[in-house]
Design a protein with these regions (language model features):
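Interfacial loop-to-helix transition and helix-capping segments at the boundaries
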Residues: 172-178, 238-242
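Outer membrane beta-barrel
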Residues: 26-167, 177-179, 185-194, 248, ...
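Disordered, low-complexity tails and leader-like regions
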Residues: 14, 159, 305-307
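N-terminal periplasmic/intermembrane-space "pro-region" immediately following the signal or transit peptide
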Residues: 1-42
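A short secondary-structure junction signal
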Residues: 159, 169-174, 196-198, 208
Length: 319
């Protein structure tokens, strides 16, 4: 078992143009096209009780720029200066919204798949991501998506796209005859309920891999209750089917004292599991896919302390 302590998982949403707007009296129309700068810094300390070892780590140091060039065209560029010590270009895309509720996105970004894998670091509930979000269903790629939102008492958000399958780096000389795809449907029900279904096809190497994911959550009255299941099948029975499950409960307790440095305290608990998993590209000497992540079960409990700052500032203590 591991004791994980995350200190100052901070997200700063900085509207760099706000001060200059006030000084130059720019029109509201001009203000809409000013770029916005956002950032996330997340440091943590982990201690492994069985081995008696510990470490400090800068898990994320993200900077992103978003904005619009015209009302129907927006953009985003995001880089992580320290993803466990490595620099990674994460998002670089342009989005066109020709009519209300319809959008077309092209570039590099996280594919529309799963619930938990789509959360940015500042949106995560725990110090470490679930197995679905980290090992089994975490995919960023280069491609294009089409999205549409149906309004009404139960809004529905649909997304579908085609992708290279090259990942984030092998783009220049990457040509393929088989295109990967992903599709996701979100149903927003009354009283804070949500149902999300998604599917994805990838081909990391010689074998195609199909993934199917279904999840539900309830977010209301300070509670967030969520459960998600992912099934992964390898073409040609190249590897055993993979099953992964994630469920957790979070409850926000608001601090009534307005002068307090703490805005809320959130106890939370999670159970997640996965069977033996292959990334689809690692082979042994006999040409068979190898296990890259062994089966495991995990129970995580802890507390998140949210500080009363102008931006998101959380201290997450997990065991």
């Amino acid at each position: 078992m591991k004791t994980k302590f995350t200190l100052a998982a901070i997200t700063m949403a900085i509207f760099s143009s706000s001060e200059s707007m006030a000084q130059t009296n720019q029109s509201e129309k001009e203000q809409k096209f000013m770029p916005e700068i956002h950032g996330t810094i997340r440091g943590k300390y982990e201690y492994q009780t069985e081995e008696g070892e510990g470490r400090f780590e800068v898990r994320n140091a993200r900077i992103s720029i978003t904005g619009k060039v015209v009302p129907m065209v927006s953009y985003k560029a995001e880089i992580d200066l320290s993803d466990e010590g490595k620099i990674k270009m994460l998002d670089a895309y342009t989005r066109v919204t020709p009519v209300d509720r319809l959008n077309f996105t092209i570039g590099q970004f996280r594919v529309p798949f799963t619930i938990d894998a789509h959360r940015s670091p500042h949106q995560q509930y725990f110090a470490n991501r679930s197995f679905i979000a980290k090992q089994v269903g975490n995919v960023r790629d280069v491609g294009a998506t089409l999205g549409y939102k149906f309004q009404g008492e139960c809004p529905v958000v649909l997304e579908a796209g085609l992708f290279n399958g090259s990942g984030l780096t092998d783009q220049k000389d990457y040509w393929t005859k088989s295109v990967n795809f992903s599709a996701k449907a979100q149903l927003f029900l009354p009283k804070g309920f949500n149902v999300t279904l998604s599917t994805q096809k990838i081909k990391p190497s010689d074998h195609a891999v199909m993934m199917y994911d279904g999840g539900v959550y309830w977010h209301a009255k300070g509670w967030h209750v969520e459960a998600e299941y992912l099934f992964k099948h390898y073409g040609g029975n190249a590897f055993n089917d993979v099953h992964s499950f994630d469920s957790f409960i979070n409850y926000d307790i608001a601090v009534k004292n307005k002068k307090s440095m703490v805005k809320k305290v959130s106890p939370l608990i999670r159970y997640d599991m996965m069977t033996d998993h292959s990334d689809g590209s690692s082979y042994d000497d006999n040409g068979k896919l190898t296990i890259t992540d062994y089966k495991r079960h995990r129970l995580t409990g802890g507390m998140t302390i949210s500080l009363a700052t102008p931006f998101v500032s959380d201290i997450r203590i997990n065991y």
